[in-house]
From Swiss-Prot:
Keyword Protease assigned: no
InterPro entries for this protein: Ribosomal_uL13, Ribosomal_uL13_bac-type, Ribosomal_uL13_CS, Ribosomal_uL13_sf
GO molecular function, a single term: structural constituent of ribosome
A Gene Ontology term for the protein's cellular component: cytosolic large ribosomal subunit
Keyword Ribosomal protein on entry: yes
Keywords, ordered alphabetically: Ribonucleoprotein, Ribosomal protein
SUPFAM superfamilies: Ribosomal protein L13 (SSF52161)
Coiled-coil zones: none
Subunit architecture: Part of the 50S ribosomal subunit.
Gene3D superfamilies with a match to the protein in the record: Ribosomal protein L13 (3.90.1180.10)
Pfam family, one: Ribosomal_L13
Protein name per the record: Large ribosomal subunit protein uL13
Annotated segments matching region Disordered: 72-91
């Protein structure tokens, strides 16, 4: 009788991928990147083990929105002080800090556990076309849609 394969840290091979965000829709890109970070694109996926790969996203400042989300979608944060609610539109966040826009979207699709935090640390987002990870020899990743 065969045993079900369970991955562990010793038999996981991690790859580095570069994804160009230019002209991509925010949600569609984020869901695909979240699946790569979790390792769901591999046959060795194991739910309780971090089997995912490293992802580098370039050109985050050229991400696109559908509809009127650039003006209508709002991001909120609160300082836990009275009157400490700060809101910013998606378009303004894209202009000021496009890296945070993508990181927030992708990390929201990962589990809210210690494993999810570990998976989120394998994400690197850059607003421009350059990245400092050439030594890792990343492969270009073609998105499905």
């Amino acid at each position: 009788m065969r045993q079900t394969f369970m991955a562990n840290e010793s038999n996981i091979e991690r790859k580095w991928y570069v994804i160009d965000a230019e002209g991509q829709t925010l949600g569609r890109l984020s869901s695909e990147v979240a699946a790569i970070l979790r390792g769901k694109n591999k046959v060795t996926y194991t739910p309780h083990v971090d089997t995912g790969d490293y992802v580098i996203i370039i050109n985050a400042s050229k991400i696109e929105f559908t509809g009127n989300k650039e003006q209508d979608k709002m991001y909120h944060r609160h300082s836990n002080h009275p009157g400490g609610l700060k809101s910013i539109s998606a378009g303004e966040l894209k202009r000021t800090n496009p890296e945070r826009l993508l990181e927030t979207s992708i990390k929201g699709m990962l589990p809210s556990t210690r494993l999810g935090e570990k998976q989120g640390k394998k994400l690197f987002v850059y607003g421009g076309a350059e990245h400092p990870h050439a030594a890792q020899q990343p492969e270009n990743y073609e998105l499905r849609g």
